[in-house]
């Protein structure tokens, strides 16, 4: 099996050891951290401040890239409109 089984206490939903958690679950924790989906159970999760910082930066970079793509697309159409008015550059 590529991922170890995750043993969880049904009463507290706390994991006994960080090493028992699957990689997929750890990735989901890092993705959920900046969204605030941990709430009161944050003390039971094995997500460090460094992982949260990496996740916040990742979300910021992704949002920036999406904004750049939208802006670039708009700028390209604007540039084409400007260049269309100059015959020797079109």
From Swiss-Prot:
Keyword Acyltransferase included in the entry's annotation: no
Role this protein plays: Essential for membrane formation.
Membrane topology: Single-pass membrane protein
Broad class of where this protein is predominantly found: virion
One GO cellular component term: host cell membrane
Keyword Transmembrane part of the UniProt annotation: yes
Membrane-traversing stretches: 53-70
Compartments reported by the entry: Virion membrane
Protein name (database record): Major envelope protein
Keywords tagged on the record: Membrane, Transmembrane, Transmembrane helix, Viral envelope protein, Virion
